[in-house]
Each structure stands twice: as structure tokens, then as C-alpha cells.
UniProtKB/Swiss-Prot annotation:
Residues 206-283 form the KH type-2 domain. Residues 41-45 are annotated as: G2. This is GTPase Era. GO terms for molecular function: GTP binding; GTPase activity; ribosomal small subunit binding; small ribosomal subunit rRNA binding. An essential GTPase that binds both GDP and GTP, with rapid nucleotide exchange. Plays a role in 16S rRNA processing and 30S ribosomal subunit biogenesis and possibly also in cell cycle regulation and energy metabolism. The lineage of its organism: Bacteria, Pseudomonadati, Pseudomonadota, Gammaproteobacteria, Enterobacterales. Monomer. Residues 7-175 form the Era-type G domain. SUPFAM superfamilies: P-loop containing nucleoside triphosphate hydrolases (SSF52540), Prokaryotic type KH domain (KH-domain type II) (SSF54814).
Amino acid sequence: MSEDKSYCGFIAIVGRPNVGKSTLLNKLLGQKISITSRKAQTTRHRIVGIHTEGAYQAIYVDTPGLHMEEKRAINRLMNKAASSSIGDVELVIFVVEGTRWTPDDEMVLNKLRDGKAPVILAVNKVDNVQEKADLLPHLQFLASQMNFLDIVPVSAETGMNVDTIAGIVRKHLPEATHHFPEDYITDRSQRFMASEIIREKLMRFLGAELPYSVTVEIERFVSNERGGYDINGLILVEREGQKKMVIGNKGAKIKTIGIEARKDMQEMFEAPVHLELWVKVKSGWADDERALRSLGYVDDL
């Protein structure tokens, strides 16, 4: 290979909600960019993660999970974001979960069959499959569904075979100049990443009670004289009862969320962070396309 040659391309990571797409992206990048939680629908924006290694630059688009339910405006916009990611990439990584196959997986597969980009099938969470004897027949079933570029059993959680996927990606990057400087890991702003970190902590500490009805707006993000950042985050919920839930008994819950979010921000921004959080009720935001636009849910569509 000539020293002057460089390779660069876009790769979409797609799949139904909660199959481990964000965890896989974070593992491919070697650090945390996309938020992860056990709750479906934690990814709401298309996050671009960038991995540069020598002559190779892979630009990953982490899509919201494609899913069948489209009644709420936020679900329609998330599906639109995921579908548009599939259309303009060099390669697709389709993530499925162990030996599970659902109508949502089928829907994603149908969209991929219509596309031109080659597809790597990442069968995630294989380490969690109880009946190992079921795995091979299931892989054979998957192989019969479409002409995949490759089928790779992986564990995004432990990192098993993630390097194999990275190697396949490198091999299929077209010759092109790099889009981003070598040290870039995402094209998202620090302000955006701060809101994602807070949202992850909300998802993590509030259990199943708040599936979509919480979002975060960063009202203030400024450098301070101590070489760090002062950040004010506004947590928006849909009902008064949810506000009480976020605040917790004598403010205990929001305090925990703030402490954990600040730790992650300091690690990501490599600087001290002073974080203040407020909670406000804004009813119906997840059903209101105008509200969603103002909160940045359609900034890249």
C-alpha cells in the first residue's frame, strides 16, 4: 500500500431498539460517545463517531432503533432518522440480539434489502444465549435471509469479536481523503454530549417509569476562570408526577443523577465541571413536532 493513500467512509449501525447498537459503537471507538441503557429508545439523535487508525478513517452513524410503533411524533422522527442513515453510507452494520428474531428485526431487514450498501450482520449478546445448541441453526436461518457481507457473532459488552467487525470495516472503506482531523472522535458539540450524558443518567436511575417522557436542554455551557465549565441543565418532563420522580425524596434522586453525570462529563471534557440541574414540566413535548424541532430532534434531517 502506498504511504500516500487514505481510506474513509460512512458506516450506519442499525437495528431494532435495545439490541446493543450504542454499546457496539462505543466499543468500536474505544470510548463512550453514544448513550447506553437497558431501556429501549435511549438513542434519539444520529451520533457520528469517528475512528481514525493510520490511513483508515471510519465514520459511524449510530441510528435510533427502527421500530414499528409510529403513533407519537418522536417515534416517527426517530424512524425517519434511522431510515435516512441507511441511504447514504458505504457499509451497514445490522445488529440483532442472540437467538431472538422479531417483527421489528424483519422490518429493518426489509429496508436493508432495498438498499445498495453491503451489510455486516452482527449477532450481539451471544454470550447470553442459554441454549448454545440453538445458536448454529439460528445463524443458518439468518444467513438465508439476505446475502450478508459477513455474519459475526459478537458481545459488544465484553468486546468479543468487535475487532473482527472493525477489520471488515477497514477492508471495505473506499479510497478517499479523511473528512475529520485524526484526533476527532465525534462531530457533536460538547453541549450536545453534556445533554446526552444527563439523559443517560436519567434513564439509568429512573427505571422503567420514564420511557420517552424526559429530555434535557442545556441552557448554559460556559468556560470558567478555573479552567473548567459551568453547565446548567434543564430536565423536561410531561407531567407533575414525573417531576417529583426525577427530584426524588428530599432531592436525593436528582442529586445522584447530577453527581454521576458530572463524573462522566469531567472524564469526557478532561476538565472540572460545575453542574446544576432543574426540572420543569412541559406537557406533550414528545407529541409536538415543533417542540421536537426546538429541542434538536430533527437537526440533521
